[in-house]
């Protein structure tokens, strides 16, 4: 008798957090696709122990769980390039969720190659930006992989439905129908969405904040700190050399204590709608403030102004999920050139939600007191300004003469 050939089960790698959405996706994938589910949890500095997820993932039906410590790679390869670029989305958002997704997707693709998986799955909803960020990264890194996005397929239409689905299958979830906030946390930030925040008229409750306090509840005494940068990268705090993750964690603690980095905004999502989010980014706000101050001291006018223009495009690329792209790499090359002399020390004052400059110095400073002084000086001939003004204003003068001659004025 011929032995019947056993066809191996196809595999899918799931971006797994242990939260509501990804918890119910495991049984759903098995029930609807018949795939073996391999879960991957990324440690990006969520501030929680991920080891307990092993038991939960297996009980939910996964064959195995990868727990990947990506914190240092996250800071050095994703956060620091964005910081050096000065990228801020719509003037407020420091992109904490945006640049985390391409890194997670990158590791999913690597595990899929190792396991021989044919598909990647994620728990992003069909209304959000994360679905785009995950899938663009996968397409850029391995276009042969199938992508499964359950929220765009299944009959579950709300978080309440998802909770019911989980309860039916005995899967514990950390969300209740009474407080259905969606939170995303990593070493850079903590975001809050959903629930009563969906009405932009509602002020965030004080107990919402987890990384810090409301500014009015911050200490009544200011705190000063000094940050040292080398070529645009922060390397030490108050004279002490710290690793990338430790530095950011320390700044989060100090900044959070003083209510630094709380942003409440209505933003334009890539998928066409507006959404309201409350973000806590204490350490990131401190780093952006310090880095910008040092750039203003060390970059010439033309470079600084042009860099501010490309910062807008860089922020759009990161927000839109186009991290793995030739344009982003090209912009990085430009930014790296601008950062060669962004080295020095910045002193900041933290007080009740405010992070203000209290001093800046650099061996590459372009500020010259001799030229800038309003007192007596011997290096600047003020008479030279007349010729400059005449030439710079010539187009305006010619136009005014033409309008006068033609009777337009």
From Swiss-Prot:
| Keyword Cytoplasm among UniProt keywords | yes
Positions binding ATP in this chain are 15-23, 42, 123
The protein's superkingdom reads Bacteria
Query: Tell me, what is one Gene Ontology molecular-function annotation carried by this entry?
Result: argininosuccinate synthase activity
Location in the cell reads: Cytoplasm
Query: What does the entry list as the binding residues for L-aspartate?
Result: 125, 129-130
Record-listed L-citrulline binding positions? 93, 98, 129, 133, 182, 191, 267, 279
* Key words of the record: Amino-acid biosynthesis, Arginine biosynthesis, ATP-binding, Cytoplasm, Ligase, Nucleotide-binding
Q: Does the keyword Ligase apply?
A: yes
According to the UniProt record, one GO cellular component term is: cytoplasm
**Coiled-coil ranges per the record?**
none
A Gene Ontology BP annotation from the UniProt entry = L-arginine biosynthetic process
Q: Where does the signal sequence lie?
A: none
One Pfam entry for this protein is: Arginosuc_synth
Q: What quaternary arrangement does the UniProt entry report?
A: Homotetramer.
Q: Which family does it belong to?
A: Belongs to the argininosuccinate synthase family. Type 1 subfamily.
What protein name applies here?
Answer: Argininosuccinate synthase
Q: Which organism is it from?
A: Desulfitobacterium hafniense (strain Y51)
């Amino acid at each position: 008798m011929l032995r019947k050939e056993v066809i191996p089960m196809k595999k899918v790698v799931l971006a797994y957090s242990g939260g509501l959405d990804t918890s119910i996706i495991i049984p759903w994938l098995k029930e609807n696709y018949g795939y073996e589910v391999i879960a991957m949890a990324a440690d990006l500095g969520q501030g929680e122990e991920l080891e307990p997820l092993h038991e939960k993932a297996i009980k939910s039906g996964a064959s195995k769980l990868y727990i990947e410590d990506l914190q240092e790679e996250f800071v050095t390869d994703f956060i620091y390039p964005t910081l050096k670029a000065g990228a801020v989305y719509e003037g407020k958002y420091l992109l904490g969720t945006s640049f985390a997704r391409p890194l997670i997707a990158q590791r999913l693709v690597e595990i899929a190659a190792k396991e021989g998986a044919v598909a990647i799955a994620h728990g992003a909803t069909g209304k959000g930006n994360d679905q785009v960020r995950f899938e663009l990264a996968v397409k850029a890194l391995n276009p042969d992989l199938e992508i499964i996005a359950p929220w765009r397929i299944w009959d579950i239409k709300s978080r309440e439905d998802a909770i019911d689905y989980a309860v039916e299958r005995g899967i514990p979830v950390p969300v209740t129908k009474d407080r259905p906030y969606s939170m995303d946390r990593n070493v850079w930030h903590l975001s809050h969405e959903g629930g009563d925040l969906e009405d932009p008229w509602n002020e965030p409750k004080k107990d919402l904040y987890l990384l810090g306090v409301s500014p009015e509840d911050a200490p009544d005494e200011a705190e000063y700190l000094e940050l040292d940068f080398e070529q645009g990268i922060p390397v030490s705090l108050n004279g002490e050399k710290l690793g990338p993750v430790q530095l950011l964690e320390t700044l989060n603690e100090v900044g959070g204590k003083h209510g630094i980095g709380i942003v409440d905004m209505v933003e334009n999502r890539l998928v066409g709608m507006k959404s309201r989010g409350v973000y806590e980014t204490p350490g990131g706000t401190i780093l952006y403030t310090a880095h910008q101050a040092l750039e203003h001291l060390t970059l010439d006018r033309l470079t600084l102004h042009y860099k501010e223009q490309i910062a807008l495009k860089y922020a759009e690329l990161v927000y839109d999920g186009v991290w793995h792209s030739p344009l982003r790499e090209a912009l990085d090359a430009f930014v790296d050139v601008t950062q060669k002399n962004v080295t020095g020390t910045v002193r900041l004052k933290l007080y009740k939600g405010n992070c203000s400059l209290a001093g800046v110095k650099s061996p590459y400073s372009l500020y010259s007191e001799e030229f800038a002084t309003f007192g007596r000086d011997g290096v600047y001939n003020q008479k030279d300004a007349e010729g400059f003004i005449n030439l710079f204003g010539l187009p305006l003068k010619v136009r005014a003469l033409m309008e006068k001659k033609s009777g337009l004025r």
